[in-house]
Amino acid sequence: MSTFINPAQMPAIGLSEEQAQLIDIAASFCRDKSPVDAVRALLEEDTGFNPDIWQEIAELGWLGIGIPDTYGGIGLGLGEIVPIVEQMGRHLLTTPFVSTVLAAQAVLRGGTEAQKNEILPKLATGTAATLGFCEDHGDWNLAHVTCKGSVAGDKLTLSGTKYLVSDVLQAAFMIATVAVNDQANLVIIPTDALPPEAIRREKIIDETRRAYAVVLDGISDGGRRRRKCAGETLKQ
């Protein structure tokens, strides 16, 4: 027997005062900064975004919304980020915003205290970052991560390929899921450690976005273990 839900019986979903204000501000900003002609012009650019607009976004404090004030952020929640992302999508304003916000959350949940103090203030003020978690099998199960990290002494050497990595050319670092000793870990990979031939642009449906395959073979942390986040947060 089918069960029907009366919409009138469903609880109303409202916006907080902060969310309502952010919608208005974000709508105005995105509308002004991303007219159709600007969107079309950026389709021909390698990066696909305007760095001056990115700097303005950082100055507005949007990158620090989901970061606690302890680490240089504003200390609100992801619910306050949603209105901004919604307006960016509506007006096709392409930036590394989502990639950087998600990378910040990965550090916040999986990093050591030293890593949080080092990285999060930078992300809150305009340093871009990204995530590398997709692999060719398309499986989201962390137990099936095929990218590996081999430990020799205090040195971690990576292998494997990540796909659909957003905004890697603009990112200062990528946080990737890697299996180390059969345990899923988050590994921080500075993008300046990636040779140009390790990054290949992929074709995707949305031409306003940039996504890449990133080959990790031979990438090493040079003994600087700070690049390795606390892996137990990803253990299944």
Question: Where are the model-predicted features located?
Answer:
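Short secondary-structure junction/hinge motifs that connect adjacent elements
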Residues: D37-E59
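Internal helix-loop-helix
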Residues: A8, E59-T125, D167-A171
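A short, Trp-centered hydrophobic/proline-enriched beta-strand micro-motif
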Residues: T125-E135
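A short core secondary-structure module
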Residues: K155, T161-A198
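Generic N-terminal amphipathic, Lys/Arg-enriched alpha-helix
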Residues: S2-I13, K33-V39
